[in-house]
Curated annotation (Swiss-Prot):
Alphabetical list of NCBIfam families matching this protein: gatC
EC numbers, comma separated: 6.3.5.-
UniProt-listed Pfam families: GatC (PF02686)
Assembly mode: Heterotrimer of A, B and C subunits.
Organism the protein comes from: Orientia tsutsugamushi (strain Ikeda)
Protein name: Aspartyl/glutamyl-tRNA(Asn/Gln) amidotransferase subunit C
């Protein structure tokens, strides 16, 4: 069982705040998840063949720079109120959202 202090500690790391009702709900949910994980941990999987070979390399495409859209095409979507600034700086101007 996970304690309220553990949930508060995790919430502090994540910069989250919970009221008492939410905190109790999180304790129940996280305890349930840990309980399920403990059940899964007890399952014997030694006879189950792996579904993926870990020796395989990732088959990813090579990174290649491609010009799909021009800066002018992008900036054509800028609202008129910030168009001059955006065209001079080549950046989108957005409202401040973090204090």
């Amino acid at each position: 069982m996970i304690s309220i202090n553990e949930v508060q500690s995790i919430a502090n790391y994540c910069k989250l705040r919970f009221n008492e009702q939410e905190l109790n709900h999180m304790v129940k949910q996280l305890s349930s998840i840990v309980e399920m994980m403990n059940k899964l941990e007890k399952i014997d999987c030694t006879s189950v063949p792996p579904m993926r070979h870990f020796e395989e390399n990732n088959r990813m495409r090579k990174d290649q720079v491609e010009q799909n859209i021009t800066v002018d095409q992008l900036l054509s979507n800028v609202p008129q109120s910030s168009a001059t600034i955006a065209k001079n700086t080549k950046y989108f101007v957005v409202p401040k959202i973090i204090e």
